[in-house]
Amino acid sequence: MLDKVKLALLISFDDFDDELNDLIGAAVLDLNIAGVDDETTVSDDPTDKLIIRAICSYCGYHFELIHGTLERSEAFKKSYDEQKSQLSMATNYTTW
């Protein structure tokens, strides 16, 4: 998953790997709190394209907030919020 996040954020070096791994873990927990089934999210290499995009968007939001621009961070946040909302209402992604 780390390689997918780095590709989405256009990062080609390893300086931020620890921070990105923490963000990936936080993204998974945030999706689980929203009701997204952890069987879908708790994988070192998820294959579901919607889950991958949501995790990348979450990481982009928080990473850009610290290391980038507020404009890019807000764009990632908007994307993540929409993805999380849709996933939390989809019956094949939720725990309820």
Residue ranges and their predicted role:
Residues 1-14, 95-96:
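Short, intrinsically disordered N-terminal pre-domain segments
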Residues 8-12, 34, 62, 66:
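Alpha-helix C-capping/helix-to-loop hinge sites
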Residues 11, 15, 41-45:
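Surface-exposed ligand/attachment interfaces on beta-rich extracellular proteins
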Residues 16, 22, 46-96:
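Short loop/turn elements at secondary-structure junctions
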Residues 21-31:
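Amphipathic, heptad-repeat alpha-helical segments
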Residues 30-38:
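Protein-protein interaction and targeting regions used for scaffolding, dimerization, and localization
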